[in-house]
Curated annotation (Swiss-Prot):
It comes from Buchnera aphidicola subsp. Cinara cedri (strain Cc). The active site is at 118 (n6-amp-lysine intermediate). NAD(+) binds at residues 32-36, 84-85, 116, 139, 176, 293, 317. The lineage of its organism: Bacteria, Pseudomonadati, Pseudomonadota, Gammaproteobacteria, Enterobacterales. It is an enzyme of class 6 (ligase). One of its GO terms (molecular function) is metal ion binding. This is DNA ligase. It comes from the Bacteria. Keywords: DNA damage, DNA repair, DNA replication, Ligase, Magnesium, Manganese, Metal-binding, NAD, Zinc. Signal peptide: none annotated. The gene is ligA. Belongs to the NAD-dependent DNA ligase family. LigA subfamily. InterPro entries: DisA/LigA_HHH, DNA_ligase, DNA_ligase_AS, DNA_ligase_CS, DNAligase_adenylation, DNAligase_N, NA-bd_OB-fold, NAD_DNA_ligase_OB.
């Protein structure tokens, strides 16, 4: 039972992290399919655990999974929870969904579904009182979102005042903010010309735009909105149909996309799915599937919800389209914690209007599993219509010119001997701050929110300080002066003084933040908290050993090995000792 519990904890942390990356930072690092696999695995493990162990359901870990809001925006509490949809990727899973619905409502002869496109944008909740837009917010964790009203007011397709008669006293309108492909292309061309970072896809561009602090930027980005549902519906006329409610919402001036379908049977739903899949490449906006809902509001309420999903609705996703290309280079990148990540470079292909020329292979095991070789022909797809991924190698096209990939044993940046994990799945460089590739990223991480949080000193400024020779190790942050900042950034006295004061203020830091700021392989915020709770002092952590680490929950061999290797490194020890003298570290 302990093994199952530990697996649940591990999956919970993974899903929380991916929720944060997707919903809060708008920067997903795994595909929707892989996310769904993790979530479904968590569901299965919880069922098994709580079946065998009689515990209060309130402590179920899955209920804690959600995306926290950024602290840039204020909180908004949804009147009715803004739930996510469970995703499926094949028609046989829809058959199962349909079967369960019909079994539950045996007394009803015809079950009617409402189907529409699953827009790939940012879900928003619009709250109107007496016909006036009072607030707009993101989904957040389903109960609490970010108040983005000022930015939403800049989107012309969102009514600021409800038109028509019989306007409800209170209503929550739910829909998707998106960017058209044509506008996305123009935006990226503009970013390219001005030397700014390009957006990876229209969804990230839309979500990133809505979270801008300057509403004028939102206005320039030409964002659009389609309504797909509602939360609170305080209306004097009783309307039991989801479809009829949407038609009423359309009469009030909200944009409802023309392609939807009221389906009387399973066959009509599947026909609509194939139709949507066929035309999606012709649309000027991204869709990644269709949404299937029970049309009757009464039946929806009877079914209710499970965990964070409604039982009466489901998202049927499209299969990703593959394209063939040829690999011409494999490089090994050094990450912040020293992790070595193989990246495949191939001749550019175009998938849904996006040019793709490389894909991460994630780890060494992927190379072995796929048997990827240099000059191989491969099929590439966008996982979840977002992340480029190699599906398979076209072995029949392999010729005598292909070359086996040689896995490095020494760091490509600093030539330090690499350390391999037990399962040989991953390897990392233990040189830490002595490795240039790591050092730049480590210094950025040290100053970030997960570290000491030096406000006002961003990534670009840190890179400049490194290039000018002012930053080599974390200690150098504390020897920065107003004069140095003014020389490099041409800042005024006030801003320079503010940054120096912020750095001085950050000298008082909790032990878990300090441990996390070091950027040890495998030690993120949650593990850092466990270590801080166990050791209670920086000196005890600094002098730890394998035996002590093995007693701490969730600290396995690989993490223990990484911690010991990091703390044994002479350069690291010197840096940590100096930091201990400079900082005021508390529990």
């Amino acid at each position: 039972m302990k093994d199952i519990y530990n697996q649940i904890l591990k999956l919970q942390l993974q899903i929380k992290y991916h929720n944060y990356m997707y919903h809060t930072l708008d920067s997903p690092i795994i595909s929707d399919i892989l996310y769904d696999e993790l979530y479904n695995k968590l569901l299965q493990l919880e069922k098994l655990y709580f079946k065998k162990k009689s515990l209060d359901k309130k402590i179920k870990l899955l209920d804690q999974v959600g995306a926290k809001k950024l602290h840039i925006f204020t909180e908004f509490f949804h009147k009715i929870p803004m739930l996510s949809l469970r995703s499926i990727n094949n028609i046989s899973d829809f058959d199962l969904f349909d079967k369960k619905i019909k079994e539950y409502f045996k007394h009803i002869n015809v079950i009617t579904y409402f189907c529409d496109f699953k827009f790939d944008g940012l879900a928003v909740n619009l709250f109107y009182k007496n016909g006036i837009l009072i607030s707009a917010s993101t989904r957040g964790n389903g109960s609490v979102g970010e108040n983005i009203t000022k930015n939403i007011l800049m989107i012309s397709s969102i009514p600021k005042k409800i038109a028509g008669s019989n306007i409800p006293k209170k209503i929550e309108i739910r829909g998707e903010i998106f960017m058209r492909k044509s506008d996305f292309f123009i935006l990226n061309q503009s970013c390219k010309l001005s030397g700014k970072k390009e957006f990876s896809n229209p969804r990230n561009a839309a979500a990133g735009s809505v979270r801008q602090l300057n509403p004028e930027i939102v206005k320039k980005r030409k964002l659009n909105f389609f309504v797909y549902g509602f939360g609170l519906f305080d209306y004097n006329k009783k309307i039991d149909s989801h479809y009829q409610r949407l038609l009423q919402i359309k009469k009030w001036g909200f944009p409802l996309y023309k392609n939807y379908c009221v389906c009387k049977n399973k066959k009509e739903v599947i026909h609509f799915y194939h139709y949507a899949n066929k035309i999606r490449s012709q649309l000027d906006f991204e869709i990644d599937g269709i949404v299937i809902k029970l049309d009757s509001i009464k039946l929806q309420n009877n079914l209710g919800c499970i965990e964070k999903y409604p039982k009466w609705a489901i998202a049927l996703k499209f299969f990703s389209l593959d394209k063939e290309t040829k690999i011409f280079k494999i490089s090994f990148k050094v990450g912040r914690t020293g992790i070595i990540t193989p990246v495949a470079y191939f001749f550019p292909i175009n998938l849904f209007g996006v040019s793709i020329s490389k894909a991460s292979l994630y780890n060494i095991k992927t190379i072995k599993l796929l048997d990827i070789r240099l000059h191989d022909y491969v099929t590439v797809y966008r996982a979840g219509d977002v992340i480029p991924k190699i599906r398979n190698v076209l072995i029949h096209k392999r010729n005598k010119y292909t070359q086996k990939i040689i896995i490095p044993t020494y760091c490509p940046s600093c030539c330090t001997k690499l350390i391999f994990s037990d399962d040989l799945k991953t390897c990392y460089c233990p040189a830490s701050f002595s490795c240039f590739s790591q050092n730049v990223k480590r210094l950025i991480y040290f100053s970030s929110k997960n570290g000491l949080n030096f406000k006002g000193l961003g990534k670009k400024n840190i890179i400049k300080l490194i290039n000018y020779g002012y930053l080599y190790t974390p200690i150098d942050f504390f020897s920065l002066t107003v004069k140095k900042l003014k020389n490099i950034f041409r800042m005024g006295d006030k801003l320079s003084e503010k940054i120096i004061k912020n750095i001085a203020f950050s000298k008082r830091v909790s032990l878990d933040k300090f441990i996390c700021s070091l950027g040890i392989f495998g030690v993120g915020t949650s593990i850092a908290k466990r270590l801080a709770y166990y050791y209670r002092s920086v000196e005890k952590f600094f002098n730890t050993n394998y035996d002590t680490l093995s007693k701490i929950d969730h600290i396995g061999y690989n993490i223990s090995n990484a911690i010991i290797s990091f703390l044994k490194n002479k350069s690291n020890r010197s840096i940590i000792l100096k930091l201990i003298r400079i900082l005021n570290i508390f529990i």
